[in-house]
Amino acid sequence: MHLKEVDIHGKEKLDVVCTSNPEEADKMISRILKRVCGLYPQYIGVDVEYTREDQPPQRAAVLQPKSLRPFLKEDRFYTFAGFSIEGDKEMLRSSGLEINPDKYIDIQRKWRVPFKYIDNHSLADVAGSVIHPFYKQMKNKIDRVEDHKLWGISPLPNYLIEYAAIDAYATYESWKRIENIREGLESAKEEEKNYDDPYYGY
């Protein structure tokens, strides 16, 4: 399934590919690997949807292409960013998959939305704060109870594919922006500390 021009914030659009073909999934993973093996830190958004809770054993509703296991365990070129991902990690583990424990970031633990005093900020809160207000309503596009029963079926309805794509993009883009701001602040602090050093930077 190829969904072109899925609307996100402003005039931005996503080009989304959803497949149940293992060979196509492996090609996509290979393409990602080629793109991320560069000089700069690379982040990959991760989110896991589950099969129906009322039809045990519940497991990750994911395909297991041959490249997925080493992709999740890779430790040099990229870091996975997710949101409240302890449940996702456990569900992946029960399906025989595991993310490298040294290469993932739980955004919910690393970032707080300023001036919003609640215990746990949602992805919608964070993405709405750092990307665009559009994302504040992203979770309202599906029925959190009934639609979550559909993740284990094939083919998935288009609106759930769109939802999953927006969710993954919001996770990735949120952390990329947060990390970019953090790096900029650290660089500015370092320059300020060495402002009077004529040899700094050489």
Where are these regions (language model features)?
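Short His-Asn-centered micro-motif
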Residues: 46-48, 66, 81-85
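Short alpha-helix plus adjacent loop in nuclease-associated cores
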Residues: 107-128
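A short alpha->loop->secondary-structure connector
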Residues: 95-104
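Short acidic, Gly/Ser-rich segments with clustered Asp/Glu that frequently serve as metal-coordination loops
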Residues: 43-44, 48-57
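Acidic, Mg2+-coordinating catalytic module of metal-dependent nucleases/exonucleases
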Residues: 128-201
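N-terminal accessory regions of nucleic-acid-interacting proteins
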Residues: 1-44, 107, 173-176, 183-202
